[in-house]
Amino acid sequence: MTLRHLTALFGTLFLVLAASAQGIRREPAFNPLQPAVHDPVAARCGDTWYLFSTGFGISVLSSPDLKSWEPAGRVFDTLPQWALDTVPGYHGHTWAPDILCHEGTYYLYYSCSSFGKNTSAIGVATNRTLDPSSPDYRWEDKGCVIRSVAGRDNWNAIDPNVFIDTDGTGWMSFGSFWGGIKLVRLDASLTRIAEPQEWFPLCRRPEGTAEDTSETDDAIKADPRGKDFDPGNGAVEAPFIVRHGDWYYLFVSYDLCCRGPKSTYKVVVGRSDKVTGPYVDAAGTPLMEGGGTVVASGNDRYPGVGHCAVVSTGEGEKMLLHAYDRETGYNAVLLTRTLAWDRDGWPSIQL
């Protein structure tokens, strides 16, 4: 081997080791059976399921069976100007959507924010179809539904979920950290808060009931610049409400997402005989006091699982959620699991 070859070899090794030392890794190839997603939610249009998730302009996948997925573009090619004007630091990476079909119209709710701040807003766009090949396919943005303002609001306007009650009333639950999960009544258009406003607290993590987050990413540590930089230690987010039998069930995610092998994300649930609560867990502890019956928690392969949605397939219910997968270098991947109910009416899944 010549000196030139040795020099080239050691140069290559140096670059590889340097890249490894800096934590550089390639994004995994698209896996149709377990695609990389954060914060999944899905709805069926015709014979096709469409999945929406966090991403630039809101990422979309499609599937005939909730099993094998393929990319289906994104919702926004042009970002809503109101969001750019309202939320400093928002540049199009749109979080935690929710999808709803009501009276022939699809409503897509979405979150505009930046990590660790509660200067945030929830918007909504509508469409007559989810099929991009249809001549009726066109997303029409309806603007801001609700926003949170730093220094004014001890809650965070992200992670929306809209539930239509049996009387036709629309309710939006939302929240992440700060004061926890809130519920507000929507007007008949499902695009604005109803007046007079009705607000209900649903879930929070009082001191001593949540994991200590004080030593996590700098972006979410307390900061003297004000409440916008102090989410507190109340790790709860991602509400999702379903009705089963005579009960309303509130699913939320507790503890820490997005930490790779150190993720502690989990899904818990409480139930109530009213959509407005109070929600309690199987032991009778209110979710407003940090209660929650565990539905899904981490294991050796998936240390953190959370941000769930529930869909009805006609043959039962499926829970969609994301998990940090050891086999993909702890990238967030989609899990789809059967939602089972025990004889006492409490849900569970098998990872």
Regions found by a protein language model. Give the residues of each.
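Positively charged n-region of N-terminal signal peptides that target proteins for export
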Residues: 1-5
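Bacterial N-terminal signal peptides
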Residues: 8-18
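Carbohydrate-active catalytic/glycan-binding domains of CAZyme proteins
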Residues: 20-351
